[in-house]
């Protein structure tokens, strides 16, 4: 996965347990220039971060090259961590049609990698994620990143795109609890 900034967390002591006993969730925040991803394993007392990072594509790259890189990098993450569920950020209203089309293409590259692996795919609107993680649907990116750091007990503040992806995964964990704040829609 050359070119992607990636951090893999050291396995926690409970990592020796069989993978099937703890659900592994992949969150993806798609963008042409910086697609964030975060992989967590549901565990007690809190979820464990397995990997996080940002798939970076320079502005000088053609769109097709970026889309291929997003697909290939996410395919590699899926193969390495074997998630059972993927959560992708839902589409948001964009005033610029060109921006909306480009975002849709990046999202499509991510969805193909997930679908090819036969994974369950859900989407959650950005406001629902912020509401679930911070308690306020219009929260700033920094507030989301700080809460993700706290919830996952990360030593460092995650990059903004990776933080959003981890927030998506955490929102899915919350959505499967009895008192869900953010309902996910299956894609």
What does each model-found stretch correspond to?
Residues 1-187:
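Phosphate- and other anionic-substrate recognition elements at nucleic-acid/protein interfaces
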């Amino acid at each position: 996965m050359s070119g992607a900034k990636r951090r893999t967390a050291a396995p926690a002591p409970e990592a020796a347990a069989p993978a099937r006993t703890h659900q592994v969730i992949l969150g993806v925040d798609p963008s042409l220039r910086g697609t964030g991803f975060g992989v967590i394993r549901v565990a007690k007392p809190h979820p464990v971060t397995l990997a996080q990072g940002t798939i970076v594509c320079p502005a000088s790259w053609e769109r097709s090259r970026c889309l291929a890189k997003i697909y290939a990098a996410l395919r590699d993450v899926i193969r390495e961590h074997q998630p059972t569920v993927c959560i992708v950020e839902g589409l948001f209203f964009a005033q610029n049609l060109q921006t909306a089309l480009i975002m849709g293409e990046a999202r499509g590259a991510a969805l193909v990698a997930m679908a090819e692996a036969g994974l369950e795919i859900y989407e959650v609107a950005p406001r629902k994620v912020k509401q679930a993680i911070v308690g306020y649907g219009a929260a700033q990116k920094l507030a989301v990143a700080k809460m993700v750091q706290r919830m996952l007990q990360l030593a460092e503040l995650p990059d903004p795109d990776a933080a959003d992806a981890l927030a998506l995964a955490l929102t899915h964990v919350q959505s499967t609890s009895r008192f869900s704040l953010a309902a996910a829609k299956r894609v």
